[in-house]
């Protein structure tokens, strides 16, 4: 599971794309299931433009799945692996505001955070209790302490509640 930001920005140099591609293809050729979550550095600010890891989805690379929208994956979606994965890729502020019609980004994020909590609860109710559940998200966690590199980020992150990621039904959070 790769939880987003394959590159430092949304327009990677061809050399970086080549080297990243070589590594993903090695995983594919070894038949190692790989989930690539789209992160904020992978996305263009313009709605409708391709993201930086789009080629793996477009080319339908075997054993590689690109996750660009919230999804609950079951074994049949995961090459019959005995696991369930809840995927939360980055949700852009502009895309979110366009989708909700909100003009206040704080209110838009608050609404989405509530909806994500409700969606995860719904997925947990639908889950198979005999299989492990992984939550993977490209988001900040309420109350988390970040390293020094985090200080350069702007304050527009989607924030998941600590209670959500500490849910006892989740076996792993990435």
Task: Annotate the PLM regions.
Residues 33-35, 132-134, 172:
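Beta-sheet entry/capping signal
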């Amino acid at each position: 599971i790769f939880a987003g930001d394959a590159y430092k920005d949304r327009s990677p140099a061809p050399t970086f794309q080549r080297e990243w591609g070589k590594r993903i293809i090695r995983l594919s050729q070894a038949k190692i299931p790989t989930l690539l979550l789209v992160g904020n550095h992978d996305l263009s600010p313009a709605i409708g433009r391709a993201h930086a890891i789009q080629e793996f989805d477009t080319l339908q690379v075997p054993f590689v799945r690109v996750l660009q929208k919230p999804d609950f994956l079951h074994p049949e979606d995961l090459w019959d692996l005995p696991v369930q994965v809840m995927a939360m890729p980055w949700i852009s502020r502009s895309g979110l505001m366009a989708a909700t019609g909100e003009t206040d980004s704080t209110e838009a994020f608050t609404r989405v955070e509530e909806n994500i909590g409700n969606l995860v609860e719904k997925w947990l109710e639908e889950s198979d209790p005999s299989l492990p559940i992984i939550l993977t998200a490209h988001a900040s966690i309420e109350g988390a302490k970040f390293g020094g590199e985090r200080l350069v980020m702007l304050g527009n992150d989607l924030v998941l509640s600590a209670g959500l990621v500490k849910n006892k039904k989740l076996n792993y959070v990435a």
